[in-house]
Curated annotation (Swiss-Prot):
Gene (UniProt): yfeD
Sequence intervals crossing the membrane: 20-40, 58-78, 96-116, 133-153, 172-192, 197-217, 224-244, 248-268
Family annotation (Pfam families): ABC-3
Membrane topology: Multi-pass membrane protein
Stretches of the chain forming a coiled coil according to its record: none
Similarity section: Belongs to the ABC-3 integral membrane protein family.
Main location: membrane
Compartments where found: Cell inner membrane
Protein keywords: Cell inner membrane, Cell membrane, Ion transport, Iron, Iron transport, Membrane, Transmembrane, Transmembrane helix, Transport
Name this protein carries in UniProt: Chelated iron transport system membrane protein YfeD
Record has Membrane as a keyword: yes
A single GO cellular-component term on record: ATP-binding cassette (ABC) transporter complex
Record's keyword annotation contains Kinase: no
């Protein structure tokens, strides 16, 4: 027990680990909340596209001497808008357009990076460097994540209805176009906030895994938000602590933990129906008047 306590408490003695844990929790919360909407909307590939497309914006921002988050955000929004325009003005399907746009922008970013002299490691951009996050970068992450969470919470029901049934949202008078591009902007902001933690490649796992895990084991969207947040925060904290002890990359450790949680949820999702079928005759015998299935909101 003392050894376990030492393993958990030892990293907190270092200031860089304190910053890393705070960044992990904040990143985990904002990614988990947004992942529920992405899973409900079916935008897994959109998150992947924008996360890869921010690379040229980061490189150009560094070259111009402006904050990297501005370049990343503009680049991500350009990818989303270009994808929507090409989809609406051509016969090509959306997933095909996204594949071409994000791969082209990612390749363009790699070429730009190879032509610019910088002491910045490409691996830190691609895979993140949470243990090396500075106080300024942490404050930046907190501001972006806080703004994103505030907007999502204020428009929670509107976004939920838009993701679940955009036609119904349009019929009742919701600004569907505004919600569409608003969600894209929030997605781009979330990716920017997560860059320091897991980089442009692995951020898609944090934007999908918590939501799909919660989707498999929950019966309502509110439950889904809570479970996704818990899963994401636990995975981020555990991954950060494990990376400290094994001297490994933080981003991949976090994603591995989330992948393990997904396997557990998948097994639970297969076992629960079997258990319910076995318990059904016993439940009916004990309480024959209350055998109707429940419909949770």
């Amino acid at each position: 027990m003392n050894m376990l306590f030492s393993l958990i408490s030892e990293p907190f003695a270092y200031p860089f680990m304190q910053r890393a844990i705070v960044a992990a929790i904040v990143t985990g919360v904002v990614c988990a909340i947004l992942s529920c909407y992405l899973v409900l909307k079916g935008w897994s590939l959109m998150g992947d596209a924008i996360s890869h497309a921010v690379l040229p914006g980061i490189v150009l921002a560094f070259w111009l001497g402006i904050p990297l988050v501005i370049g990343a955000f503009v680049s991500g929004i350009f990818c989303a808008v270009a994808t929507g325009y090409l989809k609406e003005n051509s016969r090509v399907k959306e997933d095909t357009v996204m594949g071409i746009v994000f791969s082209g922008m990612f390749a363009f970013g790699l070429v730009l990076f190879s032509r610019i002299d910088t002491d910045q490691h490409l691996s830190h951009i691609l895979f993140g460097n949470m243990l090396g996050i500075s106080l300024t970068e942490l404050k930046q992450t907190l501001w972006i994540a806080g703004f994103t969470l505030l907007v999502v919470l204020l428009k929670r029901k509107d976004f939920m209805l838009y993701c679940f049934d955009p036609n119904h949202a349009r019929v009742i008078g919701l600004p569907v176009k505004f919600l569409h591009y608003g969600l894209l902007c929030l997605l781009a902001l979330t990716i920017v906030a997560s860059l320091q933690a897991v980089g442009v490649i692995l951020v898609i796992a944090m934007l999908i895994a918590p939501g799909i895990i919660a989707f498999m084991i929950c019966r309502s969207f509110d439950q889904m938000l809570v479970v996704a947040t818990l899963v994401s925060v636990v995975a981020c904290v555990l991954g950060t602590l494990i990376s400290f002890h094994i001297d490994g990359a933080t981003g991949p450790c976090i994603v591995i933990i989330q992948a393990l949680f997904f396997v557990v949820a998948l097994i639970y999702n297969h076992i629960k129906p079997i258990k319910d079928r076995k318990m059904a005759p016993l439940t009916k015998a004990v309480n024959p008047e209350n055998t109707a299935p429940s419909n949770l909101p």
